[in-house]
Amino acid sequence: MKKRIAIVLFNLGGPKNLKSVKPFLFNLFYDKAIINLPNPLRYIIAKIISITREKKSQKIYSLIGGKSSLLQETEEQKLALTEKLKQLIKEDFAIFINMRYSAPFAKEVIGQIKKYNPSEIILLPLYSQFSSTTTGSSVKNFLQNLDIDIPIKTICCYPLEKDFIKAHVSLIKEKLYDKNFRILFSAHGLPEKIIKAGDPYSFQIKETVQAIVKELNIKDLDYKITYQSRVGPIEWLKPNTEDEIELAGKLKKDIIIVPISFVSEHVETLVELDIEYKLIADKYEIQYIRIPTLGTNKIFINSLTNILLRFINKVDTNLVMSSSSTRICPNEFTKCLCKLTS
């Protein structure tokens, strides 16, 4: 019997206008994966943060048209992926988008999936490196809202996927023409306590960067992994991207910034990297080049397509695997979705 496949793309979401900034912030900070506290304390904290940060966040979003570009970017990725898959598979399929903290929410998407009436569902996060705060939260929320009994295949991560690495390399090589450049691979930060609790995010970031550096094959390449978007007084992953730009400026080192954990343009890249961090480089009069996110880059879309083809062809159902069909995280990372290796 011919398969009928529902493919769900996960991403963070974002406000569609300035009025929706506050509810977006509340949804974000009310997530137990972000603030792991019991209610009503978590609810109160999320309310306070969403109220106190609303004006500042509105000002930031006003710099990029008063809304997040993430949904539009994801729609474009969905279209590119649909066109590519149509060329390669005979099965019926439909691609759905599920945002975690803004519409389309899981409940709405599941309603659409039920009308489509698939024989199986494949979950594909647009987070290449796994974290319990991103993919983990999205998958958990989707499954909690799912009220039909259906085979599900979950792709937890793809930090070492061949064409994913090649896509990054191709974009970097377009700009890497001077030996004086220092490459900063900038990833979204996480509190240290989340990593210490067994989250494999920083491990997978390192794996991705090492694979890119190996593929670039440049002797004595000057590069660092850095983390951006810190919030609050707690300890976050280090080094901080801002601090490393300052350091490079003092050394008169020109910079190439690679947004290594983002596959779509949104506020962290368009404002934080393109405006705020560039001002630091301008202060020191060093060259500052920002590599674009992968978006609808053909090599990246090929990467996602190849991952989906692998999972479509798997006979096993109710799978949770990395794109390589194995657990890539050492067993110490207990938050990894994949089964522990023996």
UniProtKB/Swiss-Prot annotation:
Reactions accelerated catalytically: heme b + 2 H(+) = protoporphyrin IX + Fe(2+)
EC number: 4.98.1.1
Keyword match DNA repair: no
Gene3D superfamilies: 3.40.50.1400
Transmembrane segments: none
Major location category of this protein: cytoplasm
Matching Pfam families: Ferrochelatase
One GO location term (cellular component): cytoplasm
Positions that bind Fe cation: 188, 268
Molecular function (Gene Ontology), one example: metal ion binding
Domain of life: Bacteria
Keywords in alphabetical order: Cytoplasm, Heme biosynthesis, Iron, Lyase, Metal-binding, Porphyrin biosynthesis
Pathway(s) per entry: Porphyrin-containing compound metabolism; protoheme biosynthesis; protoheme from protoporphyrin-IX: step 1/1
GO terms for biological process, alphabetical: heme biosynthetic process
Family, as annotated: Belongs to the ferrochelatase family.
Cross-referenced NCBIfam families: hemH
Function: Catalyzes the ferrous insertion into protoporphyrin IX.
Protein name, entry field: Ferrochelatase
Species in which this protein is naturally found: Rickettsia conorii (strain ATCC VR-613 / Malish 7)
